[in-house]
Amino acid sequence: HRLNRRQRQMCIRDRWRADSHCNLIHGYALQFELTFGSTGLDEKNWVVDFGGLKELKEWLKHMFDHTYLVATDDPEMATVQLLEEKNLIDMRVVDAVGCERFAELTFDKASSIIEKLYGDRCWVESVTVREHEANSATCVNMERPINEES
């Protein structure tokens, strides 16, 4: 069985390593799409209970809702920290920024939560993060590849 869930959050970041205008501070209303798999439906005929995913929803909000994400190796870290100290931004420090890394980060967090709640019955098949209609990245569970017949 497979089930999708979508969530939107607004964040700001820059890609300081980029040679293009992407190295400038800019923001997105990110859309997260999570696909869950299971060995079968539960007693309520659900793959997962979305009402029970409050921890994941709160984590997404904490990480990506009106936040400024900065990479640990950003050469302007001191400047970004100054903005945080002046309460001008709500900073989150991550290993790297971008759709690919946000998909991976969210996949890891969601997988941990789903395993804690459901054990082996459910898992995260994939996480897609969209910046806009023309740019997205997907992190796929390579241990449990998506079965199109589910």
Where are these regions (language model features)?
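Conserved beta-strand segments that form the floor/walls of ligand-binding pockets within enzyme
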Residues: 11, 35, 128
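Residues in well-ordered beta-strands of folded domains
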Residues: 5, 70, 128-130
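Histidine-centered catalytic/metal-coordination loop motif
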Residues: 15-112, 117, 148
